[in-house]
Amino acid sequence: MTAKFLPVLALAASTLSPALAQNTPYSAAGKQAQVYTTAQGTGQRLAAGPALSFQPAAQPAETQVCVFVDPAHSFQTLLGIGGALTDAAAETFAKLPKAQQQEFLRAYYSPTAGIGYSLARTHIGSCDFSSASYTYVKEGDASLKSFSVKHDEQYRIPFIKQAMAAAGGQLTMFVSPWSPPAFMKTNHDLLHGGKLLPEFRQAWANYYVQFIKTYEKLGIPIWGLTVQNEEMATQKWESCLYTAEEERDFIKEYLGPTLKKGNLGDKKLIAWDHNRDLLYQRASTVLDDPAAAQYVWGIGYHWYETWTGSSMLFNNERAVKEAFPNTNLIFTEGCVESFKLDQVNEWRLGERYGNSMINDFNAGTVGWTDWNVLLDETGGPNHVGNFCFAPIIADTRTGKLLYTNAYYYIGHFSKFIRPGAERVATTTNRDWLQATSFRNPDGKVAVVVMNSGDKPQEFQLWVKGQAASTTSPAHSIATYVLN
């Protein structure tokens, strides 16, 4: 793959405030839609097909299958779409031959030859997808005089810088801690949950500031941060627990004021950063307190509530948006767990992403962040054996990159829906077709339609009295770009 790297559009904070639907005139008369398709049982992977032409259309009958798009009514503005730049991804990247390293960077970060990632997450200190546990200070150093990110300078920082360069010099980057240093915790352990000791709340708030300032001095701008990764999970890896009230109070009494005092008040602070199941309860506890809410840009969430046997709980996102329309929702992590190399071609991987992304955006989400952008042939490295899938797997034994269909499913959004795009009204009249649409800053409208059923489905793409006839293949996703 070859490409020219184009700059990622920088967004002013003011453009990201969620709003009620706004009315902007739009007509599809005389327009065409370029079609890009990924379909099971075919060689189509983001494959361009014949353009569709729009013609005047009468009132559709109930027997006609339609995807209705109304670009005149717009909603939230897209911050970006991307994935996490972890120790595991960086170490795996370093093992690849130079040619495959460049292929990887183009594949993710070029908006022309790749899928144009514009959003990224990384971790403060170690996480499960590190080769070992570590912190940035010596044991007992609450003053942080020994603070150093020397560990990250071997793999992760150079990796992030190469990703930034491939994205045109800028990525919207947010950071998340998995655990405070062990001496700051009730269980004196980086792993296995535990809580932040009250006497170290200020030292821990200072730690975030020190990390952000250090990374920025090294040339990595930080856009925002989450309070804590997965605050309700006692994990066998790095973890730390907060009740909703503890998180609220830490934000308003320590983290928020400390960021402000450290001249980092412009960094976007994200609360929760865990599953959709408790999303409303956690968000409302923080946002109903003005002293805490003043520091909070948005609420982050993951998709792992399915561990209970539940389906994904998209209505909980909608509940937050209904109650707190001026807060932002951001998907901060998701991956398919229980890695097996012989399953990298399974179609379920991509369909999980497509289902989540369509419903998350339709619920008001402004940014969507996958977990590891790259893992090796074991689904790691991971120092506690929590091996998972990534959209791209590197077989470090051969140097070959393996593209799962999740990469292409994500690309149907990230390549064609760019930062600054506004979501527009979209509905379907059959539940086996899912769809979302955005109007890009250049005026083009991108409509993503997913068919997770076993049969192809003819339908009309219907836009304000103009329609184009097309077919959605079985187990497929397609993006229609209206010029």
Q: Predicted regions: what is each one?
A:
Residues 60-70, 157-159, 210, 253-254, ...:
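Alpha-helical scaffolding within the catalytic cores
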Residues 203-224, 231-337:
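Active-site neighborhood of glycoside hydrolase catalytic domains
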Residues 46-222, 243, 253:
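N-terminal catalytic cores of secreted or lumenal carbohydrate-active enzymes
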Residues 328-409, 425-428:
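Aromatic/acidic polysaccharide-binding cleft in carbohydrate-active enzymes
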Residues 1-28:
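Bacterial Sec-dependent N-terminal signal peptides
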